[in-house]
Amino acid sequence: MISAGYCRLMSRYNTWQNASLVTAADGLTNEDRWKNRGAFFQSIAATLNHLYWADALILARLKGNERPEETIKHSLTSPSDWADFKALRLQRNEEVEEWSARLRDADLGGMLVWYPGDGSTRIEKPKALCVMQLFNHQTHHRGQVHAMLTAAGAKPEPTDLQMLEY
């Protein structure tokens, strides 16, 4: 289905695209970053925060660790400080890249089991599918942020995968 090489490529793409969005958002005021723009998570900042949290959640599952303490609701407002967010985003990018660097093709086989926040239902899915969800989820929400930034007059970089420098 997918390979460790695919994961390393997508991790690099993730880092590049996150840097593009953060750089573009740097040109906005804090008020502009938190402005409700009618998107699913309302604002640029809330959507970026959600993505930061979800990366931690999915990585924790893939590593066999406990879920992050923050809930999805909390993920929309924290971190609230832009400088803090930027530092944390860089760390999370590094975490994703380090995870993928250690990954072997065999690590993508088998099933992943977890319980959602309320602990009510056992979920079991193919591990490769969960890894694909990590990257698909990132792309989905970054597309929303890209659209909001563009509408706000900012200029994020192109998103085409073939534009990623080797």
Each PLM stretch: what is its role?
Residues 1-8:
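Basic/polar N-terminal segments that are highly enriched at the extreme N-terminus
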Residues 8, 59, 83-86, 109:
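Generic detector of well-ordered alpha-helical segments enriched in charged/polar residues
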Residues 8-75, 117-166:
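Short, contiguous alpha-helical
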Residues 66-106:
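Helix-adjacent hinge/juxtasegments
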Residues 102-118:
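Acidic catalytic patch
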